[in-house]
A protein has these predicted regions:
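Exported/extracytosolic protein signature
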Residues: 2-7, 24-164
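Bacterial N-terminal signal peptides
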Residues: 11-21
């Protein structure tokens, strides 16, 4: 990976980590963000298998898997936990890829002001008229954890994005 791409990708990771909500951190929640890629690795048997590893080369078109792990480091259950995460501007969200066991995932196309299902959202088209939102319009993701997180327990949410 060239130096410019390395700096650019490091900036993407830092932006994603710094944008995690302070409210979640104040509630005793510990958050960790990782950027991973699935790479093809040839095994000893000669078969090619996919292996997930930290991103080492991100070129336009590369698919990055963002994993945000949350852990309740407090002494009490953490309730009403919401994790907001921006999609870095150099990335395009992969529609339908936001996941997390026991969570409800939503997207925003207006800088995180309103959230909902992608198919229910609209943006202003080039002609100034409203049009259905598309994956490339997504600016933020939000996961609402459906149950309280017991002390010491953890979980994770993920999404995929393509490098522009």
């Amino acid at each position: 990976m060239n130096a410019n791409m390395s700096r650019r990708f490091a900036g993407l990771l830092l932006a994603a980590v710094l944008a995690l909500p302070g409210a979640a951190l104040a509630a005793g929640l510990e958050l960790k963000s990782e950027a991973l890629q699935d790479v093809a690795v040839k095994g000893k048997d000669g078969k090619v298998q996919k292996k997930r590893q930290a991103v080492t080369n991100a070129v336009p078109g590369s698919e990055i898997i963002y994993v945000i792990t949350y852990r309740n480091g407090g002494a009490k259950p953490a309730a009403d936990v919401v994790i907001n995460n921006p999609v870095p501007p150099q990335m395009v969200y992969v529609a339908g890829s936001a996941e997390g066991a026991g969570t409800r995932a939503e997207v925003s196309v207006d800088g995180g002001k309103q959230f909902g299902a992608l198919e229910a959202l609209q943006v202003k088209g080039a002609d100034g008229k409203p049009r259905a939102a598309r994956a490339e319009d997504v600016t933020h993701l939000r996961w609402t954890v459906q149950t309280a997180i017991a002390p010491g327990k953890e979980g994770s949410v993920t999404y995929r994005a393509l490098v522009r």
